[in-house]
Structure formats: C-alpha cells, structure tokens
Amino acid sequence: MKNTIAVLAVSSLLAFSACKKTENTAVADKTEASQPEKFTVDSVKVSDSSKIADSLTVSFTSKLLVFPALKDRKLLDSIYFQNKGIKDFSKNGLQAYLESDKNKYFKSVKNDSKDWISGSYAQDWYTNSHMNLVSNENDYMHISYLWSSYEGGAHDNYGFSERVFDLKKNKKLELKDITSMPKAKLESILMKNINTIHSGTSDNGGDVKNSDMLLVEVIPATDNFYFDQKNLYFHYSPYEITAFAAGDIVIPVSWEELKGTLNTEFKERMKIK
C-alpha cells in the first residue's frame, strides 16, 4: 500500500512539473511573440554594363535599402515611390526587382536609340540611382534618393529627393505635419535665406552667390525637405530654381524662424525648445 501511495505521489509531482513547464513555455513563447522585430537596415545593389553596339556602351547601377522590420504596405510603397510595381519587399524580392529593372533599361536603350547607334563616334551612357539612410531619430527616418544619368548631350543630369517617414504613424511626413506657416510667408523666408549655404560655384571673379543664379521669382516650399535639431532644410535639384552650374541648392529655415507655427507633437518629439 505504501509503495502504491509513493508511486502516485511521484506521478502527481511529475504531472505537475510537466504542466508547469508547459505553462512557462507558453508564457515565454507569448512574451517572445509580443516583442517587436528589431529595426535593421540592409541593402541590395546591381551594377552591370552592356555593349549595345560598337558605338554605344550603357551602364546600370542601382542600390535599394531593405527594411526587414517594416511591414506596412502603404509605408513601403511610399518608401519605394521611385520603383513602381514592387510586390515583394524582402531582400530577395528587391534584388530580383533590380535585375528586372536593369534588363528593361538595356532593352529600352537598344530599341529607342537605333538612329543614334548609327553615329560615327562612341559614347558611354549610364543611369545610376541610390537610396541612402541619413538618419533615424525619434522615429523619424530620413532617406535621401540620388539619381544621375547621361544619354548624350552636353552634360549629364542628376537630382535629389529627400523624404522623411514617421515610423510611429507609418506614413511619409508632410510639411503640414511640421508647421502651419502660410506658404507665401515660408517662401519669403526661403528667398531671404537663399545664400546661407553656398553652392560652391565660382567664376573668374570668384564665388558666385546662389541668388545670382536664380531662374525663378518665387522659391517654392516643396515636399523635398528634411531636418535636424537646428533647421528645416529644403533641397533643390539642378534647374529646379537655379542654373545647372549652381548644382543642387540647400536652403535652411531655422526653428526660431518657424516659432509659433510648429506642430505640437512634432515639437515635443524633436525636443525643440
């Protein structure tokens, strides 16, 4: 009888331990599942060239960032706004997209440049595009997009796009999310600050002011902006507001100049006094 009681006691203890272990495992699994995926950044790149004819060689280079932790489709579509038709945002999916994009580019140049190919002198054409993560602070992620190309003519062309994404709200940040300042007043500040950051352009007489190369009477307050702890910056590509010789132009607007118009949530997240 005593042996029977002992066996039952041991069996009960083992059953209790197994049950407890199962509960602990379930709690651990639940805790692990509730942890958000760590924010990481990777990249994919394709660089290749093709000899279209004896007179023409074309090169293709493109780099895309990869964000494994980002799952929101609308946010991802906005991040890859220059790359239409992406269905798979994984590293393998983006690599495959770039390979397809490269092949389409080579094919289009071959089909669209038959008249030029018959020319008598050789040239090298190219197209480049790059995504670069500039910063990710206070859940505001700033990505800079650069493209450049040459397909005949006097010189190559290039341009920039700046985009800031609110990772808390899964959306691209708009100017209205930062300031309520009327557009006309903001544009007057841009005109006033046009020479704050020198473009580096010079001629025989020395440095040339940005304002001396303006092609517009009003500098538009566009969505091509980014910011840091001191300023809001507007970035303009060649020909957008100035002559090509001026290059790209960056115009800062200080938080002090925007005082009284800053969005409360933005101001708190950026810790602007």
Please give the residue ranges for each predicted region.
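C-terminal motif of bacterial Sec signal peptides marking the signal peptidase cleavage site
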Residues: A15-A18
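Sec-dependent signal peptide recognition
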Residues: K2-A9
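Compositionally biased intrinsically disordered regions enriched in Thr/Gly
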Residues: K20-K273
